[in-house]
UniProtKB/Swiss-Prot annotation:
GO terms for biological process: mitochondrial electron transport, ubiquinol to cytochrome c. GO terms for molecular function: metal ion binding; ubiquinol-cytochrome-c reductase activity. Keywords: Electron transport, Heme, Iron, Membrane, Metal-binding, Mitochondrion, Mitochondrion inner membrane, Respiratory chain, Transmembrane, Transmembrane helix, Transport, Ubiquinone. The keyword Electron transport applies. Binds 2 heme b groups non-covalently. This is Cytochrome b. It is found in: Mitochondrion inner membrane. Heme 1 (or BL or b562) is low-potential and absorbs at about 562 nm, and heme 2 (or BH or b566) is high-potential and absorbs at about 566 nm. It is a multi-pass membrane protein. Heme b b562 binds at residues 83, 182. Component of the ubiquinol-cytochrome c reductase complex (complex III or cytochrome b-c1 complex) that is part of the mitochondrial respiratory chain. The b-c1 complex mediates electron transfer from ubiquinol to cytochrome c. Contributes to the generation of a proton gradient across the mitochondrial membrane that is then used for ATP synthesis. Its cofactor is heme b.
Amino acid sequence: MTNIRKTHPLIKIINESFIDLPTPSNISAWWNFGSLMGVCLVLQILTGLFLAMHYTSDTTTAFSSVTHICRDVNYGWIIRYMHANGASMFFICLFMHVGRGMYYGSYLFMETWNIGILLLFTVMATAFMGYVLPWGQMSFWGATVITNLLSAIPYIGTNLVEWIWGGFSVDKATLTRFFAFHFILPFIISALAVMHLLFLHETGSNNPSGISSNSDKIPFHPYYTIKDILGLLIMLAMLMTLVLFSPDLLGDPDNYTPANPLNTPPHIKPEWYFLFAYAILRSIPNKLGGVLALILSIMVLAITPLLHTSNQRSMTFRPLSQCLFWLLVADLLTLTWIGGQPVEHPFIIIGQLASILYFSIILIFMPISGAIENQLLKW
């Protein structure tokens, strides 16, 4: 009798994706983050589902309902903080995953990479709309500022913004539709993630050396299942440490003040994982220019495959490109810091220089260093 694992129509799919999947024998812990994001997504959907059972998407009761969840619902506080900090863990894994893709040349799997960029945009949209739901000061003003950016679009901008708001300002209609979208998007993300895996399994995984590993594959289970479980335990330990010891560390104190359209907070800023993009947005003194730079800061990932000049896929044996990569990481950390600072000297000029450097590294220096390294190999 043949194994049911290999013959059953449904179990066969799982088997070919997680058990008998031929995997390179040398992939490092940097390849853990995909599965960690899968776990984050499941965790977010589950905690979000339980929060939605008690949350009300009405401007008069939204803030109170979140307070009610934390005070009166059994274990509501832990569900709420796991959901809020789970988003942060999700983005940490996301940034590591994208960084890994850039370092090891995974972007040459074009379909997988482009679906990944689409996933990144969708996750960012979901997180933004989720941040609006508690209806605190930063929720309200964050929603106002970010949706207002669309008014920079020539001719249709103002109409578009009012259409998204469902009125002439961020109000009840906006909150209700954001809740609806925030609920549906994670399921769209799940579908995109399945497509992401589908295209990845067409080619097989990349590996740190960047050369074909077809001659040296091992089954995913038990080798990488156990390795993924280790990564999972580390991530859950970090998440629960954050949730149980300092749940508000990454939040904004202003969000504990109910939304008030008549009182603007002194510093409007998004959650930490958007600060790098926010800094790029603010570094351009023109509204439309800033919005374009904001979109390009992520869309620039889409042209990285076209800018790959090196004869080698991975950066493992390319010291010049490695230096540029880590400079890019440092630059992103600088942008994240600047995004949380007030708009005054010297932060303005630091933000502008960091923004220029960000685009310069990806669009100019990386391709040049790849070409230089090709020449160096001839010596």
